Amino acid sequence: MKPRFESSLANRAAQVVITLAGLALFLAIRPDIYASVSNRLMSDYQRKVVTPKLISDYMQRSREPKLQVGAGLNNADGWLNSDIEPSATQAYIDITERLPFHDMTLHAILGEQVIEHVTYEEGFRFFREAWRVLAPGGKLRVITPNLLSFVALFSDQKPPAYMARKLDFHYWPADTPDPACFIINGEMRSWGHQFVYTPKMLRASLEKAGFADVRQYAPGVTDDPDFKAVEVRAKTEWKDLNDFDSMAFEATR
């Protein structure tokens, strides 16, 4: 007769095999759940394992650390590129959360077409966090839609070809009876937009967050070569749209 503990061990092993086989069968039957679980595990791994290492390695080798939030496909050389849905080489950073940097450690922060995707309160907290992590003299540059430009669509204060090109750019219907109405609704509600600023509101928010030197620029225009090298929308064939309906602000700590 074999000892009981061997039998018990064999039983447990069999139970594990049966459980795993059942789980595999269930996931094969429900690929949607498999995809959801897989994506969650990958996201957690990216956030908790990959991102801390990416940030640590970058901060150690960079003499003037620069952070790009909401980078998307724009992986700028010399920058720590981040996104809420990061690629394999990007850090996971959610601008509604505390930024994972020590006080006064970054040289520059860039957010191109990002801040409008969060609420006003979340945006203000991000500005406060940016002020905290920037070194004295460090700069934050924000490029975002300008609400005044969309209000101007209801007057004659717009480029003649703007509305047709805007509708074409977003694949919106060209035969809409009121293009201005369609565009402003789209800009306020599409792509997860939460809050679209006027220049007055954005300047006031940055100043309230602690920035002393706040300046407005046209998109793509800057005195800082670091920002000029990484900003992308001002370099595309749709530059004319960006020039009219977006604004850029730089704020110095």
Regions of interest found by a model, annotated:
Residues 1-62:
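Membrane-proximal basic amphipathic "stem/tether" segments
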Residues 36-74, 222-232, 237-244:
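SAM-dependent nucleic-acid methyltransferase catalytic core
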Residues 49-53, 93, 125, 197:
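Short, conserved clusters of charged catalytic residues that mark active-site
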Residues 64-152, 249-253:
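Conserved SAM-binding loop
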Residues 122-131, 135, 139-252:
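S-adenosyl-L-methionine-dependent methyltransferase catalytic module, highlighting the catalytic core
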